[in-house]
Curated annotation (Swiss-Prot):
Keywords recorded for this protein, A-Z: Abscisic acid signaling pathway, Acetylation, Calcium, Cell membrane, GTPase activation, Lipid-binding, Membrane, Metal-binding, Nucleus
Species, as recorded: Arabidopsis thaliana
GO biological process: abscisic acid-activated signaling pathway; positive regulation of abscisic acid-activated signaling pathway; positive regulation of GTPase activity
Gene: CAR8
Protein name (Swiss-Prot/TrEMBL): Protein C2-DOMAIN ABA-RELATED 8
Manganese found in the keyword field: no
């Protein structure tokens, strides 16, 4: 991947109150897309509150590019049913990457991000310093569906020899 500035690790933790698509339940999985990159979690059978705890890693060459999360109900014989989508707003996360972490103690809050029309946050999100890393936990409100949220955590991974953004 040309002009790689780093990697974005997305830990897809769990789904909350996802819609039922198959007889009072669903078999959900998540697809994360950024540009031409498309990654997916494993499916969880018979759950509207799945625990994925899967890590997906995207190569980032443009920090302003959109990251989309889509939830689907896995179907064996027909096309997968959409269960909602959300935009992952990574701009506030990238803006704090230049923070000097040498003086930070574990658990230090670097920034708060409030829900707005510019993001899909279901509640306020905190960017924190934890165990030598800058992390952001988010609960995303799914769009284009009756109900559902997805809890994720993002982490920046520096790539040796990459240029600063």
């Amino acid at each position: 991947m040309e002009n790689l500035v780093g990697l974005l690790r997305i830990r897809v933790k769990r789904g909350i109150n996802l819609v039922s698509r198959d007889s009072n339940t669903s078999d959900p999985f998540v697809v994360v897309t950024m540009g031409s990159q498309k990654l997916k979690t494993r499916g969880v059978e018979n759950s509207c509150n799945p625990e994925w705890d899967d890590e997906l890693t995207l190569g980032i060459n443009d920090p302003n590019q959109h990251v989309t999360l889509e939830v689907y109900d896995k179907d064996t014989f027909t096309s997968h049913d959409p269960m909602g989508d959300a935009e992952i707003d990574i701009k506030p996360f990238f803006e704090v990457q230049g923070t000097d972490i040498q003086e930070l103690t574990n658990g230090t809050e670097i920034r708060r991000v409030k829900p707005s029309g510019d993001n899909c946050l279901a509640e306020e999100s905190r960017i924190i310093f934890s165990n030598g890393k800058i992390l952001q936990d988010m609960i995303l409100q799914l769009r284009n569906v009756e109900s559902g949220e997805v809890e994720i955590q993002i982490e920046w991974i520096n790539v040796t020899g990459s240029s600063d953004f």
